[in-house]
Amino acid sequence: MAQAMASMTGLSQGVLPSRRADSRTRTAVVIVRASAEGDAVAQAGRRAVIGLVATGIVGGALSQAARAETVKTIKIGAPPPPSGGLPGTLNSDQARDFDLPLKERFYLQPLPPAEAAARVKTSAQDIINLKPLIDKKAWPYVQNDLRLRASYLRYDLKTVIASKPKEEKKSLKELTGKLFSTIDDLDHAAKIKSTPEAEKYFAATKDALGDVLAKLG
C-alpha cells in the first residue's frame, strides 16, 4: 500500500512539470503569433501611409504641370488705355485718381452743354414724379430719389451755365440757387416725415424747376 502511494505521488510529480512546460510553450507560441500579427499590421499601415504620400506628391506634380500649361496658353496683352474711350466712360478713371482732389473725382459723366440741358429736363421731370411717393409717405424713397436727381441736376446746370454768355449767367445762377434751396427744404421735410412741409416745398420746387427750364429755353 505504501509502495502504491509512493508510486502515485511520484507519478503526479512527474506529470505536473510536463503540464507546466506545455502551458509555457503554448503561451510563448501565442505571444510570438501576436507579435508577428502586430508587426504585419504595422507594416501594412506604413505601406498605406507611404502610398498616400506618394499619391499626393504625384498628384501635386501633375496639377502644377497642368497649371503651368494653362498659364502658358493665356495671352496677356497691353494694359487698356486710360478711360477706355467708350461712351459713358470718359472720366471713369477719375474716381481712382488719388492725385486729384476729392471734389474733382466725378462719378457723373460730363456731357456737352446741349446734352446736359436735355438731361436737366429729364432730371426735373423725375423730381416732379416724386409726388406719388410723397402722397404715400414713402419718405426713404423720396429722399433717395430726390438726392440722386438733384445731384444730376446740379452737375448739368453747372455745365449749361458755364456755356452761357456772361449776361445770362447771373440770372441763371440766381434761379438755380433758389431751386436748390427749395430742394434742400423738401429733403428736410422728408427727413422729418412731415407731410404738410413736404407738400409745401414740393410745390415750391416744382415752380422753381419751371422757372429754370423756361430760362434755359
UniProtKB/Swiss-Prot annotation:
Q: Which GO terms describe its molecular function?
A: calcium ion binding; electron transporter, transferring electrons within the cyclic electron transport pathway of photosynthesis activity
Transit peptide range per the UniProt entry:
1-68
> What is a single cellular component term in the Gene Ontology annotation?
photosystem II oxygen evolving complex
Q: Which domain of life is it from?
A: Eukaryota
Keyword Chloroplast found: yes
> Which terms does the UniProt entry file under GO BP?
photosynthetic electron transport chain
| Keyword list, A-Z | Chloroplast, Membrane, Photosynthesis, Photosystem II, Plastid, Thylakoid, Transit peptide
Q: Which Pfam families match?
A: PsbQ
Q: Does the keyword Thylakoid apply?
A: yes
The compartments listed are: Plastid, Chloroplast thylakoid membrane
Family label: Belongs to the PsbQ family.
**UniProt protein name:** Oxygen-evolving enhancer protein 3-1, chloroplastic
